[in-house]
């Protein structure tokens, strides 16, 4: 049985909202960790911070051998698309959150 286009659009909208919420949770989690590590008080450009996060993500995915051994960090192989978005959100959120909480 075929679904009407309106029902498919509704399902897509629900999935997009779920994705937005999941990305927000991921960004908040990474932001909290970054603040605990002291990144909130450091003046650094967002592009430079994003590059550092991408390097860190490669390390945990096994792209670069780390001293402690690489692990997946619980990330799915397709987590690459949201990793950049999360890192960008953390870059702007860490600077804002760090000034307000410190």
UniProtKB/Swiss-Prot annotation:
Residues 62-72 have a biased composition (Gly residues). It comes from the Bacteria. It comes from Sinorhizobium fredii (strain NBRC 101917 / NGR234). This is Probable conjugal transfer protein TraC. Coiled coil: none annotated. Keywords: Conjugation, Plasmid. To A.tumefaciens Ti plasmid TraC. InterPro entries: Conjugal_Transfer_TraC, TraC. Residues 73-93 have a biased composition (Low complexity). Pfam families: TraC. The gene is traC. NCBIfam families: CjTranTraC_Agrob, PRK13848.1. Residues 61-102 are annotated as: Disordered.
């Amino acid at each position: 049985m075929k679904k009407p286009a309106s029902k498919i659009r509704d399902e897509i909208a629900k999935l997009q909202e779920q994705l937005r919420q999941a990305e927000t949770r991921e960004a908040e989690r990474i932001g909290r960790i970054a603040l605990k590590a002291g990144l909130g008080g450091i003046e650094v450009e967002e592009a430079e911070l994003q590059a550092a996060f991408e390097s860190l993500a490669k390390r945990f995915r096994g792209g670069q051998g780390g001293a402690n051994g690489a692990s997946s960090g619980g990330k799915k192989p397709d987590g690459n698309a949201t990793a950049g978005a999360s890192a960008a959100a953390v870059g702007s959120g860490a600077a804002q959150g760090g000034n307000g909480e410190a």
